[in-house]
């Protein structure tokens, strides 16, 4: 009995959690909520007092060497909730700048390790798309985006049905070859070919991953920065129905559409950046220079959730032996973008579709996760972090996509207008997070403001989506939304 109590009080950090809290990375998560009403801080504090002890990570401390969670029976919630004074004379535009600067400033201050590693910041000021802002900041060692989002959604209810929990989109199951009728020999050939392709793709991806660790670097562009810079956080809300329209017309997934939009936006942003540089220098974009732009190597780390399905219930994640797993159960894909202006915006979608289909037919995500755990156990956390940091330094950006509630939700009487998750601590100058919410898609960007114009990049992402929608409508492609 005594041993069991000690195990509950002391829990080892997972290998990925240990990596995230190392000083050379020290990665954190920020989630910005836009509320449709002013936020009552007392309601938030009372709710936290009732729920914080239900979730072990949020009432635990890191031990001195950062290898174990130590359960604490005392959490002073008031010390975790901050309500800064905001000048009531500020305009909506000024408030939006204030919110961006405020979030940037708090991410530069390390979380206090003498208490659980989370904070809540309440900004009761009106912006263009919300009456008030709530910012949750926590350490990535507590869990990945799926874990934290699942925890937050467990505390929300549907605005239309105050007693009902929020619902998430259910992934559609694809029909397996095993359930299709046909000549058995033909099915056998398909299985053999598919297996060979899977092995080949995995070997190629493994080689590219190792090459990136040791020598393969992305081209230096106006999107590639240096580690240690302060991050600026911005977001843009677009129509999820527009994305679904493109998805159905092009017969692809929402993830495919978002990658196509990203490739188009990055291309537009880079070409305009180089055009501006040439104008300032009094030169033109020569054919040789154009050829150089077309040969840019620009890769993103796409974060992949390794759980069986998308966001999980907290009960499932906390259950011992569960396959859902609370914590940092994620891996990455190395995804190359093609930087070339296209007269037809739908070409961007075709480009990413062929590449992501090949990446899906590979075991590289599981190999990277298993390899990271092996290196930590065999050679120590410093070697593993050095490898992870090298991959991030030699690539340009990071992308994540999370499914959110299918209907509007409220938190203890506060209807939520949007969720905007992001991350800080990575050495890359750019991260993009996509999150669906009701009939919206929220695009969140975190950038090094000395290198990248966050608002300009958001403009390009929004414009690229509009161009693709117009191209679909002009070509008369089937455009039903579901």
From Swiss-Prot:
Main location: membrane
Function text: Bifunctional wax ester synthase/diacylglycerol acyltransferase. Involved in cuticular wax biosynthesis.
UniProt keywords, alphabetically: Acyltransferase, Cell membrane, Endoplasmic reticulum, Glycoprotein, Membrane, Transferase, Transmembrane, Transmembrane helix
Compartment list: Cell membrane; Endoplasmic reticulum membrane
Domain of life: Eukaryota
Organism listed in the record: Arabidopsis thaliana (Mouse-ear cress)
Reactions that this protein is recorded to catalyse: an acyl-CoA + a 1,2-diacyl-sn-glycerol = a triacyl-sn-glycerol + CoA; a long chain fatty alcohol + a fatty acyl-CoA = a wax ester + CoA
Segments traversing the membrane: 196-216, 329-349, 367-387
Organism lineage string: Eukaryota, Viridiplantae, Streptophyta, Embryophyta, Tracheophyta
The protein's name in its UniProt record: Wax ester synthase/diacylglycerol acyltransferase 9
Active-site residues (renumbered): 140 (proton acceptor)
